[in-house]
Design a protein with these regions (language model features):
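Conserved lysine of the Walker
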Residues: 36
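Post-Walker A helix-loop "phosphate-sensing" segment adjacent to the P-loop in P-loop NTPases
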Residues: 45-57, 299-307
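Conserved NTPase motor "head" modules and their coupling/switch loops across ABC/AAA+ ATPases, GTPases
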Residues: 1-31, 172-313, 322-326, 330-333, ...
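Long, charged N-terminal accessory/stalk domains
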Residues: 123-124, 130-179, 183-186
Length: 367
């Protein structure tokens, strides 16, 4: 898969952009705050209708403008695609795939897949559990439409349940509606656990190999999926997980009503990471955790290849400059096969190390 051409209109700091990309390596060079990251964000958004940075979609629209558009000529699954996304203040997002309206943003993932790696991802191992849940969610939403739907359903039910518990002291009758949202959370939560467990199983295998190679075989990486304690086997069928979640909800109902909080569920899942058998989040060095995070992102790419038999777009956003020369070399030796976008600053020596089409960005324009 690849993006051949990209057009932006009033997107972030781009007033208007029309650019053609190389099918292999694209190096985007420029000083900080010129628009390099915004360009990669547009590509990620085209692959999933999810921004890796914006809290709300209106942040994507240029300051002072009321609407923006992203358009790309893409090639995937042995055919050409025209992808278009339009955003306007006060109106619903519009997505077209070959001029046909898409019902869900996830339909874009059937065309393009992307692995996005930014400097914040280097903190993936040391950050809280929410960062690792987001890592799983971002990867799985591109791979499994059922997962993306279950995640949306779970979040809606969780928000409703949280409000019910929070307001139940003042409005006790709200508790009568709680069983319905418990049911919905168990149904969608079982799907999340089912796919997360399988993802982490493959993640552990691929990341262990990448980590061993990058560290020179000195350390062993361990990856363990952590979910609700009463789930005896996260790799069990969805129906089994559902029944165990229902039992878990029943046993925690009194405590949840007393605390007026949703105490447990897949919204608290995590990935436990060890390096050399030691808890990586607590005891590993910065270099060790960066190597592990790097292994996670490279493993994500391999999992996508395994499941879809296609190579996703790889976007490295100013991340190579954060790595030491050894890790830089390792990444550069692993990115062949597929379209790659790499950003770096003018003064970085990376521009001379990378062979590919070079774009220089200044003030939201290619110069």
């Amino acid at each position: 898969m690849r993006i051949d051409a990209l057009k932006l209109q009033s997107f972030r700091n781009y007033d208007a952009l029309d650019v053609a990309f190389a099918p292999d390596c694209n190096v985007i060079v420029g000083e900080n705050a010129q628009g390099k990251t915004n360009l990669l964000e547009a590509i990620v958004y085209l692959s999933s209708a999810r921004s890796p940075r914006a809290r709300v979609e209106k942040e994507l629209i240029s300051f002072g403008k009321s609407e923006c558009s992203i358009r790309a000529d893409a090639f995937a699954r042995s055919r050409e695609f025209l992808l278009e996304i339009s955003l306007a203040a006060g109106r619903r997002r519009k997505i077209l795939i070959n001029k046909v309206p898409a019902k869900k943003g996830g339909e874009l993932s059937d065309v393009l897949g992307a692995v996005y790696f930014c400097p914040e991802d280097l903190l993936l191992i040391r950050d809280g559990a929410a960062a690792r849940r987001k890592f799983m969610d971002d990867a799985l939403c591109q791979l499994r439409a059922r997962y993306a739907q279950a995640l949306s359903d779970y979040h809606r039910a969780y928000e409703h349940k949280t409000r019910i518990l929070r307001d139940s002291e003042e409005y006790p009758s709200l508790l009568d509606t709680l069983p319905e949202f418990d049911l919905r959370m168990a149904q969608s939560g079982a799907v999340l656990i089912y796919y997360r467990a399988r993802f982490c199983e493959r993640l552990g295998e691929y990341a262990r190999i990448a980590h061993r190679e990058c560290s020179g075989g000195r350390e062993e990486l361990g990856v363990t999926y952590q979910t609700v304690s009463t789930i005896s086997d996260p790799l069990a069928p969805i129906e089994t997980i559902y029944e165990q979640l229902r039992a878990h909800q029943s046993s925690h109902a009194t405590a949840e009503r007393a605390s007026r909080m949703c105490l447990s569920g897949p919204h608290k899942d995590d990935i436990a990471v060890t390096i050399g058998g030691v808890n990586a989040r607590q005891f590993s060095s910065q270099g060790q955790t960066r190597t592990a995070a790097l292994a996670f992102k490279l493993a994500e790419r391999e999992i996508y290849r395994e499941i879809t038999s296609r190579t996703p777009l790889l976007l490295l956003d100013d991340v190579l400059s954060e790595l030491d020369p050894k890790r830089q070399e390792y990444v550069l030796n692993r990115i062949s096969g597929g379209q790659v976008f790499i950003t770096c600053c003018e003064e970085d020596r990376l521009g001379t190390l990378l062979s590919g089409k070079v774009f220089r960005i200044a003030n939201g324009a290619v110069v």
